[in-house]
Amino acid sequence: MALALVLNSGSSSIKFQLVNPANHATDDPFVSGLVEQIGEKMGRIILKIEGEKVVKEAPIADHSAGLSMSFDLMTEHGCGPSQVDIIAVGHRVVHGGILFSAPELITDEIVEMIRDLIPLAPLHNPANIDGIEVARRILPDVPHVAVFDTGFFHSLPPAAALYAINKDVAAEYGIRRYGFHGTSHEYVSSRVVDLMDKPAEEINTITFHLGNGASMAAVKGGVAVDTSMGMTPLAGLVMGTRTGDIDPGVVFHLARNANMSIDEIDNLMNKKSGVKGLSGVNDFRELHQMIEDGDQDAWSAYNIYIHQLRRYLGSYMVALGRVDCLVFTAGVGENAHFVREDALAGLEMYGIKVDPERNKLPNDGPRLISTDDSTVKVFVIPTNEELAIARYSAKFAE
């Protein structure tokens, strides 16, 4: 069985899967793994091999050690790199800037180009590069492919992509809307073609990727025309710990009046804000329970979250002119029926009618949650970025 190794390397963790690129969307990966607490006193490797869970705790010095130890553990259970047919390695890379609009075969030159983009993604691209360099050393004889979160949004028209800031400054420092979660938005907007009785080029879709990080996209005939995240993943919707859209003047206000440094403000807006900053939690199950218990902070946080979803929904309905379907995906989008219900409440005049019973069904594959007479079809489609990356990567092994 030909397999692709898919790597998502973070600052202190590595997520990976061994995936058959020929899998159906609902098929489980052959192996999934998580290396966490890299560089701390004690780290942990969690493997799931054909449904069986394997856990190992040990100090993990760096990404190289984490991946090597994971491969050793896989070998102990009969699925190491020398025991299975790995035909390609796909790497999730957060930021491709304006340089990369499609997956790229990784070479030394490509690595340096990704390194040059670190100022645009200082929290993510360095870790992505670590994963690339480690994997290329361990698996030097298979193609390694970079798949960029930003790639799907290279099609944004100038009116959506450019900011009203001095054009010379923007050009010098790469200031523009790049968008993120592109692999997920592209995946679910292509999957919806299987559920609609129309060719892809005739389908206008609004996609909701709602996880701890959250974004929306307007997709016209399979091509992205707008998205909520911007130059960074901080913009747009209210998120688990991120502010989403906020007046840039808040940064100046905090610097001048709270004597906060740029790094402190960065940390505040990325890690201590959003739903958690407003309510104390960023798990929507906890938030929902707090609301039912009468917690006013939780209620306020939820209302702000829903308000922002509806603002972007209205904006994208106008941008597209005609909307054929809405798609919810990712952790919150797939599992929080109350978010979907409240985000779309009262929109019957626009042809959006959610079926309450369908909406509350458990998350079990792609499904329609709108009524039969809803002009705009509403779907829940589980995202599968790993399968998408595996398929992109396998093409380079053909």
Curated annotation (Swiss-Prot):
HAMAP family: Acetate_kinase. This is Acetate kinase. One of its GO terms (cellular component) is cytoplasm. The gene is ackA. Homodimer. Belongs to the acetokinase family. It comes from Corynebacterium efficiens (strain DSM 44549 / YS-314 / AJ 12310 / JCM 11189 / NBRC 100395). GO terms for biological process: acetate metabolic process; acetyl-CoA biosynthetic process. Coiled coil: none annotated.
